[in-house]
């Protein structure tokens, strides 16, 4: 097996070979590079973390995993002046970059299969791109998982592989969203074991069997262990006991779906002197009025300031927000990986030309779908892809008469169907997405707004979830960065009805916008929505969609508080 690149023909290659022959120099070089690269992944690019760190605030970030939040909270209480979050993120980035660089240099200097080197580069590129597409995922978590996967490809001992597994799980605990990433990690390592066995053409796995079995045990136990840790964090941490507790903090509650909105809210909070918390743990706003009544803060909505008390509210548990957690179906994938790996270990593996393409397509499936799929109905075609890949990968399985080309073609067909079908339908119309009457009528509104490409400020009330509304808006080319789910805001301030009557506005769902603006603009006299949008958000809003139980009204703003009806049903 040749190295991916002719290293000795250039200065850079000679330098890498020199480092690979002297471990001490290699470690010094990697540590220096890791230190230099850390600012590129610092919290300066993350407005929420930067705000929490540099403002001296040590209250828990609600977007983080409860277990990690509990650790940060406990350490912060012990050392109030220590920037715990910054130090922890810096440490994670330092170790992750070190592991990534070491993996790449090992691939360049050693005679490793080119497919493993390509896999390493693809892993790094994917997590970098995914962090760009999904900025709510903290970069340190993505780096930790990518480095664990890449370093596993060059690990030769079970201790190193155990460390990679634990390091990956540590990255998962940084964010609550990362729990489901355990599933594709299992697939990644299963594919790597297949590559190693194909490369060495062994009848049995020998030294691979123990480390592989150990990894599977840890991975299978990871989901319930993380769930137990989450419950422990809820029970032990005063910040997560029965809901939300802002200890000596003043919180500006907002529902911006992305960090661009949060960045704007940070500017608002800086002007009002409020701390900002991303309110993404509530299913919807139906519990917010109850929370306000319990805290007796109806007239001071923008400054919920409760010292020593707990605000009772209903939180989304991980198994409710992420169907993969707490569900038995995802556990099938590690089990299937174990069975298929066992077959390959026991039987003689016959290397074929189609093995590498199968592995490549399997990686594409894992990357594109396993980490992003929340709908359980998609598990069936994904499982079929796994089976087809396994058939074409191992010619000694019972179904060896099926040509590898057919398996690859069917897998590509399934992938194309899942990728191109934005409605979530499965091939052949097995699963058909249905809309309620209200959602279908809202679709008419979206079609109308698509023909009028103004920047829209929309309330999605007819949709069951915000993600559903966001998907519809993207399909209709609306500005999703200016979409805010304001359902329930009109319940905050009953006294605002006087201003509605004075402006001859009868639609309560139009009132919620002005209430929403007045709520954020604490201390500002005028409730006008237009100056606020232009000044704070930079949005020159031309239309407002008010959707209530299937009925809609589209208003055009003429002046600060004058609205003209454009269209209604």
Residue ranges and their predicted role:
Residues 145-160:
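Membrane-interface transmembrane helices that cradle and orient dolichyl/undecaprenyl
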Residues 161-178, 182, 187, 216-225:
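Membrane-interface alpha helices of multi-pass inner-membrane proteins
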Residues 113-114, 161, 206-221, 396-425:
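Signature aromatic-anchored transmembrane alpha helix within multi-pass, membrane-resident enzymes
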Residues 139-142, 180, 365, 371-394:
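Hydrophobic/aromatic-rich transmembrane helices and adjacent perimembrane loops
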Residues 446-526:
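Short periplasmic/luminal acceptor-recognition loop of GT-C membrane glycosyltransferases, typified by
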Residues 34-52, 59-72, 80-83, 434-437:
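Extracytoplasmic catalytic/substrate-binding loops of multi-pass membrane glycan-assembly enzymes
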Residues 14-17, 96-102, 313-350:
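Hydrophobic, aromatic-rich transmembrane alpha-helices
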Residues 180, 211-284, 458-466:
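Juxtamembrane membrane-water interface segments immediately following transmembrane helices
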């Amino acid at each position: 097996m040749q190295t991916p690149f002719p290293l000795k023909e250039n200065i850079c290659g000679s330098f890498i070979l020199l480092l690979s022959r002297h471990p001490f120099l290699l470690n010094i070089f990697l540590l220096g590079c890791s230190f230099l690269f850390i600012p590129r992944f610092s919290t300066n690019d993350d407005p929420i973390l930067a705000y929490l760190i540099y403002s001296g605030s040590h209250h828990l970030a609600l977007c983080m995993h409860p277990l990690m939040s509990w650790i940060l909270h406990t350490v912060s209480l012990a050392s109030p002046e220590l920037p715990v979050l910054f130090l922890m993120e810096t440490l994670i980035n330092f170790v992750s970059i070190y592991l990534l660089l070491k993996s790449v240099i090992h691939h360049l200097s050693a005679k490793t299969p080119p497919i493993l080197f390509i896999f390493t580069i693809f892993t790094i590129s994917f997590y970098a791109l995914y962090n760009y597409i999904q900025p709510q995922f903290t970069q340190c978590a993505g780096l930790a998982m990518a480095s664990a996967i890449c370093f596993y490809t060059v690990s030769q001992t079970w201790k190193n592989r155990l460390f990679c597994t634990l390091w990956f799980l540590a990255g998962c605990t940084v964010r609550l969203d990362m729990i489901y990433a355990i599933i594709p990690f299992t697939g990644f390592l299963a594919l790597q074991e297949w590559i190693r066995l194909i490369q060495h053409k062994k009848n049995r796995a020998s030294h691979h069997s123990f480390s592989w079995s150990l990894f599977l045990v840890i991975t299978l136990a990871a989901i319930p262990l993380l769930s137990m840790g989450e419950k422990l964090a809820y029970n032990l941490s005063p910040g997560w006991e029965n809901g939300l507790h802002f200890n000596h903090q003043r919180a500006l509650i907002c529902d911006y779906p992305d960090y661009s909105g949060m960045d704007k809210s940070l500017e608002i909070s800086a002007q009002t002197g409020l701390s900002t918390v991303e309110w993404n743990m509530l299913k919807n706003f139906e519990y917010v009025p109850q929370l306000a009544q319990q805290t007796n803060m109806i007239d001071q909505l923008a400054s919920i300031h409760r010292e020593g008390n707990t605000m009772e509210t209903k939180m989304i548990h991980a198994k409710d927000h992420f169907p993969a957690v707490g569900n038995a179906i995802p556990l099938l994938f590690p089990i299937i990986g174990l069975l298929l790996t066992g077959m390959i270990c026991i039987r003689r593996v016959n290397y074929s030309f189609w093995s590498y393409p199968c592995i490549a397509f399997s990686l594409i499936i894992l990357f594109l779908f396993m980490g992003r799929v929340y709908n359980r109905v998609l598990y069936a075609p994904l499982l079929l892809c796994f089976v087809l890949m396994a058939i074409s990968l191992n010619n000694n399985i019972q179904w060896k008469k099926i040509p590898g080309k057919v398996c690859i073609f069917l897998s590509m067909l399934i992938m194309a169907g899942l990728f191109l079908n934005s409605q979530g339908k499965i091939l052949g119309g097995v699963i058909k997405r249905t809309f309620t009457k209200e959602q279908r009528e809202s679709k008419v509104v979206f079609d109308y707004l698509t023909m009028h490409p103004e920047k829209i400020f929309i309330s999605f009330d007819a949709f069951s979830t915000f993600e559903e509304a966001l998907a519809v808006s993207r399909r209709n080319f609306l500005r999703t960065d200016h979409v805010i789910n304001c359902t329930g805001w009109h319940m905050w301030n009953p006294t605002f009805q006087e201003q509605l009557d004075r402006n001859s506005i009868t639609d309560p769902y139009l009132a919620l916008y002005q209430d929403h603006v007045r709520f954020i603009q604490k201390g500002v006299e005028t409730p006008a929505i237009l100056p606020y949008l232009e000044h704070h958000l930079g949005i020159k809003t031309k239309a407002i969609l008010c959707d209530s139980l299937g009925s809609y009204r589209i208003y055009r703003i003429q002046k600060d508080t004058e609205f003209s009806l454009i269209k209604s049903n």
